[in-house]
Amino acid sequence: MAREKFERNKPHVNIGTIGHVDHGKTTLTAAITNVLAKKGQAKVQDYADIDGAPEERERGITINTAHVEYETDTRHYAHVDCPGHADYVKNMITGAAQMDGAILVCAATDGPMAQTKEHILLAKQVGVPALVVALNKCDMVDDEEIIELVEMEIRELLSSYDFPGDDIPVVQVSGLKAIEGEAEWEAKIDELMQAVDANIPEPEREVDKPFLMAIEDVFSITGRGTVATGRIERGIVKVGEEIEIVGIKDTRKTTVTGVEMFRKLLDEGMAGDNVGLLLRGIQKEDIERGMVLVKPGSITPHTKFEGEVYVLKKEEGGRHTPFFAGYRPQFYIRTTDVTGQITAFTADDGSDVEMVMPGDRIKMTGELICPVAIEQGMRFAIREGGRTIGAGVVSKIIE
């Protein structure tokens, strides 16, 4: 069977459902596909299809995630739904499923619960830019006042985590009734998707951001100079442009005198390309894996940062024993291991803990032995002798 061509006639946006267990995230996901399928904008997926999510491995961590796609009148969406709470935590920290925005599902029968809060906090820390609220199970609440109270509570909660709680749309839905085909609840799913279209901003394309390429390998070509290879993470680089080499050693400038891909010469390389860049006046020993080539002034190297970290369980290939403050692992950042130290940590809710056990989630302060190009929202792995023992995201740059 020939593969279907991916139509690029609508902007593509990645979203997901987040919220407390049993508040109806998966049912709502199924409802969206059911309602949109009637307009020919989705394939019907039922609860079991989505709930039986296959296991995926990202950075050595096993995560269950379901991927659903559908479109509205103006956009094409890829939607992720995770069956278990632990899967969400891992997913958001490793960035396995990038989210440009999320639908926060909260049951009107319960109101915001522990994981509702945790998912909002996670969304804030890993940089999910916008949320829309689906107040689910509204068919089960007869009293309009109760629904209004729950809505107020959610808005206050969102504001307390620096989301614009007063402005975020809250749509009253019933995933179950929409699947059963009740017209008024189907209309509510349409209303929800209109809110998603209008309130989750179209992501800035990687190509439009300032140029960055992490160096994976370095060669010297006799008579031509030094070539750095890697995958361009974002932006565009043109032949003749000045760039900076950042990280590990002092930042220095150079000019790109050639861009090659698959042994062919190009005028420019763009986000997603695996290229070799010929650098003027640079010796092979001046640069190494782990440095980044960037648009001048767009990024600075740092040594101290705060991060949100998930520490792998023993069964996931992690440590068998706890670690304490002062622990010195390697931090795998973009393309290389950099030795560093975890100088301090707290539990994910900010409470003090003496030690970190396999399977814990922590906030940590890390200090690297040499400065590298780290940015807020960037993912990293924590490794020990080449095996991953944790995954994290940079929540704040300190210095």
Swiss-Prot record:
EC number: 3.6.5.3
List of residues binding GTP: 19-26, 81-85, 136-139
PROSITE patterns in alphabetical order: G_TR_1, G_TR_2
Chain ranges of the tr-type G domain: 10-204
A GO CC annotation given for this chain: cytosol
Annotated localization: Cytoplasm
Sorted UniProt keywords: Cytoplasm, Elongation factor, GTP-binding, Hydrolase, Magnesium, Metal-binding, Nucleotide-binding, Protein biosynthesis
Pfam families linked to this entry: GTP_EFTU (PF00009), GTP_EFTU_D2 (PF03144), GTP_EFTU_D3 (PF03143)
Recorded catalytic activity of this chain's protein: GTP + H2O = GDP + phosphate + H(+)
Residue ranges of the region described as G3: 81-84
Chain segments carrying region G5: 174-176
Signal peptide: none
Top enzyme category: hydrolase
Region (G1): 19-26
Gene Ontology MF terms in the entry: GTP binding; GTPase activity; translation elongation factor activity
Residue span of region G4: 136-139
Residues annotated for Mg(2+) binding in this entry: T26
UniProt region (G2), positions on chain: 60-64
Family statement: Belongs to the TRAFAC class translation factor GTPase superfamily. Classic translation factor GTPase family. EF-Tu/EF-1A subfamily.
Description of how the protein assembles with itself and partners: Monomer.
Role according to the record: GTP hydrolase that promotes the GTP-dependent binding of aminoacyl-tRNA to the A-site of ribosomes during protein biosynthesis.
Annotated protein name in UniProt: Elongation factor Tu
Organism: Synechococcus sp. (strain WH7803)
Gene from which this protein is expressed: tuf
